[in-house]
């Protein structure tokens, strides 16, 4: 925690400097590699961690070394992780998927925006200073066409996006030759299908079955294809966004870039303050990962924050606005039904979802059914025209462990299952949002209920938090639950930062939340037995046993913190080659002792072997050459 708190002006200036001087940056001793596919333009980025060799013998003057293989890892940082790419936030990222979208021939450019709100914003000269300069000309599906990845998958089409994902999910593990690195414990997958090698056909089949989604709006061509499904790597989402109280456009762009650097697979823009439209445009044009939103937040801003004044027309206009900007998935709270609201009256903490409480208030004030539920088919028609995935929101999720797994929570979940089938009628991709606050012994039921009632659509949960006693540490309390539910089959985990329940997260909070959740996701992949998940762990363990300190730092999820902690007590360069750390010192290091025991045992084996040979030699009479019949 910083010693001095920056003023708002200083925070904005710092963020502006960050994005003005932004360059592609690699992690220490890592380099960007690309693996190409068969489709034109399929060039999948990964980070390769370079390792130092292992000392295996020789003399001080002529040591002998054995090379250690470089470790390829999944990389969400996009162009920001490649030092060879020139970054210009004012211009945005290259449109990676544009040629693929155009080649399909099923979209058309819009000469006029569909949203009245967008038209008004574009006509307002007073916003010119805030506006992203290179506004994208939006596309939509041609009349009678659907442009979703689910639509293509159901027709047996393997898209470039699917091939890109197959290569990405394999994480370059085919490059690893060492048996030590390839060793992996069997997992317990709870019914997940985890093939040894992920093919583009497997990706297509999972999407076609609705078990996985590829969030990829045709108006967000800058994004690198990724997949969310329980038969793939567990993903992590980071939330950013301004509020009426704090944050600015430059700070949100900074948080976006920061999030992708630290492993966010998707980012949700939850802005509720001024200039939501303009902020989102900057984020989308500079995001290599899918962007999600909760459209009801902006719709509420359009009616001056009065939930009772919300209308379907205002909400529909917001969907069109965001779809044409390029939002990849919408959280829609269509399962908060009028008859479910009284079920929350017995709760300790009531309705804690912002979207859920907005819709509950609207339903009660009008005594009408949720207009998102009533107009759900129209929502699906919009999504099908732009390939916006639906994240069906858990507006009645528990906000305390006392309220976990109650009647209201599961009633809504069952409704989300009904809505999933409707969305699939329109070839719209769907995932299901989940809790919340759930003690450990009650977590697995959430997964089994979701699989059964939501037809194996991907599950996307906030945590869950396993205890309510640790404000300031809720990234820990929720990371425990996230690891568990990820193991049970949850496809994506929404991070929680140390500021949860306390305030809007800053850059450092975003990093802490992401590191915690990358640990949880990776632990879940290990427990499930995801092929190749253990390679990095094995490389780290080998480096640790061999006292290759630099490699230990570089293999870490956060190399900078690992190095800083080591250097607090052993800052000298000699500490980077020492066969001990400050925890135990040179005399009591268990790994150093283990090495000595191993070397001693090997020497003893040789000595015993030599003694046996000597005894055998004497027993045969001490002759140098044996007679032929004795040999």
From Swiss-Prot:
<keyword id="KW-0949">S-adenosyl-L-methionine</keyword>
<feature type="binding site">
    <location>
        <position position="268"/>
    </location>
    <ligand>
        <name>substrate</name>
    </ligand>
</feature>
<feature type="binding site">
    <location>
        <position position="460"/>
    </location>
    <ligand>
        <name>substrate</name>
    </ligand>
</feature>
<feature type="binding site">
    <location>
        <position position="501"/>
    </location>
    <ligand>
        <name>Zn(2+)</name>
    </ligand>
</feature>
<dbReference type="Pfam" id="PF01964">
    <property type="entry name" value="ThiC_Rad_SAM"/>
</dbReference>
<feature type="binding site">
    <location>
        <position position="433"/>
    </location>
    <ligand>
        <name>substrate</name>
    </ligand>
</feature>
<feature type="binding site">
    <location>
        <position position="437"/>
    </location>
    <ligand>
        <name>Zn(2+)</name>
    </ligand>
</feature>
<keyword id="KW-0408">Iron</keyword>
<feature type="binding site">
    <location>
        <position position="584"/>
    </location>
    <ligand>
        <name>[4Fe-4S] cluster</name>
    </ligand>
</feature>
<keyword id="KW-0411">Iron-sulfur</keyword>
<dbReference type="GO" id="GO:0008270">
    <property type="term" value="F:zinc ion binding"/>
</dbReference>
<keyword id="KW-0862">Zinc</keyword>
<dbReference type="GO" id="GO:0009228">
    <property type="term" value="P:thiamine biosynthetic process"/>
</dbReference>
<keyword id="KW-0456">Lyase</keyword>
<dbReference type="GO" id="GO:0016830">
    <property type="term" value="F:carbon-carbon lyase activity"/>
</dbReference>
<dbReference type="GO" id="GO:0051539">
    <property type="term" value="F:4 iron, 4 sulfur cluster binding"/>
</dbReference>
<feature type="binding site">
    <location>
        <position position="589"/>
    </location>
    <ligand>
        <name>[4Fe-4S] cluster</name>
    </ligand>
</feature>
<dbReference type="Pfam" id="PF13667">
    <property type="entry name" value="ThiC-associated"/>
</dbReference>
<feature type="binding site">
    <location>
        <position position="333"/>
    </location>
    <ligand>
        <name>substrate</name>
    </ligand>
</feature>
<dbReference type="InterPro" id="IPR002817">
    <property type="entry name" value="ThiC/BzaA/B"/>
</dbReference>
<dbReference type="InterPro" id="IPR038521">
    <property type="entry name" value="ThiC/Bza_core_dom"/>
</dbReference>
<comment type="subunit">
    <text>Homodimer.</text>
</comment>
<dbReference type="InterPro" id="IPR037509">
    <property type="entry name" value="ThiC"/>
</dbReference>
<feature type="binding site">
    <location>
        <position position="239"/>
    </location>
    <ligand>
        <name>substrate</name>
    </ligand>
</feature>
<feature type="binding site">
    <location>
        <begin position="394"/>
        <end position="397"/>
    </location>
    <ligand>
        <name>substrate</name>
    </ligand>
</feature>
<dbReference type="GO" id="GO:0009229">
    <property type="term" value="P:thiamine diphosphate biosynthetic process"/>
</dbReference>
<comment type="pathway">
    <text>Cofactor biosynthesis; thiamine diphosphate biosynthesis.</text>
</comment>
<keyword id="KW-0004">4Fe-4S</keyword>
<keyword id="KW-0479">Metal-binding</keyword>
<dbReference type="InterPro" id="IPR025747">
    <property type="entry name" value="ThiC-associated_dom"/>
</dbReference>
<feature type="binding site">
    <location>
        <position position="297"/>
    </location>
    <ligand>
        <name>substrate</name>
    </ligand>
</feature>
<feature type="binding site">
    <location>
        <begin position="353"/>
        <end position="355"/>
    </location>
    <ligand>
        <name>substrate</name>
    </ligand>
</feature>
<dbReference type="GO" id="GO:0005829">
    <property type="term" value="C:cytosol"/>
</dbReference>
<comment type="similarity">
    <text>Belongs to the ThiC family.</text>
</comment>
<comment type="function">
    <text>Catalyzes the synthesis of the hydroxymethylpyrimidine phosphate (HMP-P) moiety of thiamine from aminoimidazole ribotide (AIR) in a radical S-adenosyl-L-methionine (SAM)-dependent reaction.</text>
</comment>
<keyword id="KW-0784">Thiamine biosynthesis</keyword>
<feature type="binding site">
    <location>
        <position position="581"/>
    </location>
    <ligand>
        <name>[4Fe-4S] cluster</name>
    </ligand>
</feature>
<protein>
    <recommendedName>
        <fullName>Phosphomethylpyrimidine synthase</fullName>
        <ecNumber>4.1.99.17</ecNumber>
    </recommendedName>
</protein>
